[in-house]
Swiss-Prot record:
It comes from Gloeothece citriformis (strain PCC 7424) (Cyanothece sp. (strain PCC 7424)). Functions as an electron carrier between membrane-bound cytochrome b6-f and photosystem I in oxygenic photosynthesis. It is found in: Cellular thylakoid lumen. This is Cytochrome c6. It comes from the Bacteria.
């Protein structure tokens, strides 16, 4: 009986952890600095001066399947359309940090 109770408690604990949202991997504080130095010209305040319909707001990131750390890292690294690639200008850690920053700001509404 004791073993059964222990197993049930362990299962509940593990199940509870599965509902916790994952933390972003990068350093948003450093990402803010990277964003200011490299992204602000086009994306000040989460906007987009090239294509006003594709902002960094949560709703637009969701609409274009970009509300995802890996998707943002890929676009920052490789560029897309009018957005230049930053893969040779930024380190992988800087790209991770700026992607984390963008996601955190999008979640908070810029």
């Amino acid at each position: 009986m004791k073993k059964l109770v222990s197993s049930v408690i362990l299962a509940l604990i593990l199940f509870g952890f599965s509902w916790v949202s994952p933390a972003f991997a990068g350093d948003a504080g450093n990402g803010s600095k990277v964003f200011s130095a490299n992204c602000n010209a086009c994306h000040l305040g989460g906007k987009n001066v090239v294509n006003a319909a594709k902002t960094l707001n949560k709703s637009d990131l969701e609409k274009y399947a970009m509300l995802d750390l890996e998707a943002i890292k890929t676009q920052v690294t490789n560029g897309k359309g009018a957005m230049p690639a930053f893969g040779k200008r930024l380190t992988p850690d800087q790209i991770e940090d700026v992607a984390t920053y963008v996601l955190e700001k999008a979640e908070k509404g810029w």
